[in-house]
């Protein structure tokens, strides 16, 4: 247990920040999962792109708040959009084979 007044405050502040960071992290992870689920369910192009934009915004917000490092944010966005682009290419390929 902390003894000094400042140490007690640090414990309180750290706990608040931990909970806030956890909330941001959970939020952007869920946004990413929504995109992946939409891709797996074969959702239309517009739906997937809209979800991807929301996920990108959530990741950017987590980076700006200092929850994750900017390089980690860039890596997560890159991996997400790589999956999105592969899905969009497969949709286009399916359309061209049907014609």
UniProtKB/Swiss-Prot annotation:
The keyword NADP does not apply. Gene3D superfamilies: Ribosomal protein S20. One of its GO terms (cellular component) is small ribosomal subunit. Keywords: Ribonucleoprotein, Ribosomal protein, RNA-binding, rRNA-binding. InterPro entries: Ribosomal_bS20, Ribosomal_bS20_sf. SUPFAM superfamilies: Ribosomal protein S20. One of its GO terms (molecular function) is structural constituent of ribosome. Belongs to the bacterial ribosomal protein bS20 family. Binds directly to 16S ribosomal RNA. This is Small ribosomal subunit protein bS20. It comes from Thermotoga neapolitana (strain ATCC 49049 / DSM 4359 / NBRC 107923 / NS-E). The lineage of its organism: Bacteria, Thermotogati, Thermotogota, Thermotogae, Thermotogales.
């Amino acid at each position: 247990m902390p003894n000094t007044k400042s140490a007690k405050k640090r414990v309180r502040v750290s706990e608040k920040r931990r909970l806030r960071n956890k909330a941001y992290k959970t939020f952007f992870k869920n946004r990413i999962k929504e995109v992946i689920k939409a891709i797996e369910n074969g959702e239309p192009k517009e739906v997937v792109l809209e979800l991807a934009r929301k996920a990108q915004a959530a990741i950017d917000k987590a980076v700006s708040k200092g929850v994750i490092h900017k390089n980690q944010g860039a890596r997560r966005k890159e991996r997400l959009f790589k999956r999105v682009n592969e899905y969009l290419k497969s949709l286009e390929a399916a359309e061209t084979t049907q014609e």
